[in-house]
Amino acid sequence: MTRLNRRDLLKAAGAAGALNLAWPLSAGLTPAQAREAAEALGADYDPAPFTLGVASGDPQSGSVLLWTRLAPEPLAAEQRLPEVVEVDWVVATDPALRRVVARGTAPASATLGHSVHVPVSGLSPGTRYWYAFTALGRTSRTGRTRTAPAGHVASVRFAAANCQAFHDGFYAAHRAIAREDVDFVVHLGDYIYEHGQVGGVPADHVRDHEGGETLTLADYRRRHALYKGDRSLREAHAAHPWFLTWDDHEVVNDYSGTGGGAPFVKRRAAAYQAWYENMPHRDAGATALPDPEIHRTRRWGDLLELTVLDLRSHRSAQNLPDGTILGARQKSWLKRNVDRAPDTWHVWANSIMLSQLRGRPGGSHMFTDQWDGFLAERKEVLSHVHGSGLEDLVVITGDWHSAFVDDIRPDFDDTSSPVVGTEFTAHSVTSGAYSADWNRTNGPLMGAANPHLKYFEGNRYGYDVYEVTPRRFSAHMRVIADRRDPVSPVTTLTTFHVDRGRTGSYEDPATRNSPAQWRREQ
């Protein structure tokens, strides 16, 4: 067999779609060379046309959203498919799909990238289901999902992941999430990254992006397809239902709302459409595009209320006296929800850090792209939480590529300001963090500058698992040994608890001696 160099393999894979046995001849490659091309990208797809796998999302007590996308040539600019393909779906109460409870057919249209979003209703609360799709004479892998319970719930366990730069590591964290005994997964944003190739896959990168920076709908579709080329990500989607929000890299770094003129608005619309096409996201039919509605509130029986926030679509520029990170409509919605919130645990899925973060005593805010760039609105919202009497608030956050635990106060500069909740910021799945030297030097400085900061650890990668009962909310920081290893083992670094009816968190005594660059003495 004639061996191709890496550049030729990447070019062929990008032009035709890696690891799909329908494309090697059109790209001038044999099947063996096609597999080599896929390996050069670090991609490994399911059999066509269901190369990108299956997923479920937004579980409710009688309904769940099922997703797939037909992509026989996942990295091609266009799919060689009919304009509309009929896709059959089935839902059953057993993995063999024999005890069928629902079935139907949905159109996969080229207009939406041949994606399928099926809201299945009439299901039983708190029940596990299995599902699959069939199209073009082929059947997808079988996915597993579950509905939310109704009424009394004794416990819930869920995972949270964020920031998964493809070139920075393999998705061992998602491999572990797929194997976790959790009810659902929350993704907190930066699902993809928009920049082009890092070039040559240097020592600190295990694989590379395909092509240049994403600008068009075709670009964003290919980037999503590349990320789903990691088998572990597809396994995590197939294993559990997901709730999702986004941050900035799904479009472009640090963007705000529609700021940037007509070219940016067009780019954002393309990015949002590709995101919707590739996610198990439930939206209200014709209103889904060009602006999918991300923010929502969902109940897990009488135990937990999950509020998913959108901190990108409606924000103004940062550092304005009247600036907004939520937008007027979403802020009013959030306040109304706070006012009528049930007596339960309240979890906000929040893509960027809510708590104040100064780099050193007397220093400025480290990053004003997060809530620190919207001081008046943050104080307004958290003061409303306090005034409403809302208790048992936990905010789960991504973006920082490091783990933080913070007390939440309406006024972070006033140590007498009441604690109204706890924020857990999770490690990234793969996205690069600061160096160990930086963390060692700056961890104590951040601790001294932020009296509300209880914990900081920035040398590891992974995800969080949250375990909730009527009496306690526990956050387990799950970390991988090596992001360069696709099957890296996972361990629990430390655990923090929040007791019901009490403000603030505390570290579990059994893990209090675990490595960290800052922890406040308790």
Residue locations for each model-derived region?
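Metal-dependent phosphoester/phosphodiester hydrolase catalytic core
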Residues: T2-Q522
